[in-house]
Amino acid sequence: MTVEGVADRRTAPSARYQPVLGTLGFVWDQAADQVLLIHRTRRADGKHNGLGGKLEPDEDIVTGMARELHEEAAIVPTDMRLRGTISWPGFEGPDGDDWFGFLFLITRWTGEIPDSNDEGELSWVPRSRLMAWCDPATRSDSGLDLHEGDVHFLPLLFDDDPRPFHALMPWEQGRPTGWSVTRV
């Protein structure tokens, strides 16, 4: 299958898709209907995002997500569900590093969440504000700055469909160039 914007980058017959494996988790306080976001002020683009990062060689995705939650928010998840996966070819870096992410929704945890960490500031955002960012008509009113492609998957994280989603979102020159998703 050829995906626009991806095939052009891989002209060498020996080129293989060997993405960075990562986790991305959204901590949801259901009682308050708020989602924990980090404003990654350490990075030049300073985006708001869920918590997560690269898997270590000795980790499975659950262990890696739990480690990232502890490192970034000082919490231990007690209810964590894999909601989906996304392949992000060309996502990050000057050469467009490929990423493959495992997306989690965390609804119970132990620990006290600090106001910040080495990556940036942590804050609780009403889920309605996060969903407002996903709507082009209300995006500017949300006061959030997320990655442009997040508009596609954020609603899937919080919907009632129990099936995980599996998506492809190619990137080129710092912007998403496509989106396809399947649920099984």
PLM features: what roles do these ranges have?
Residues 155-184:
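Charged phosphate-binding loop/patch that engages nucleotide di/tri-phosphates or the phosphate backbone
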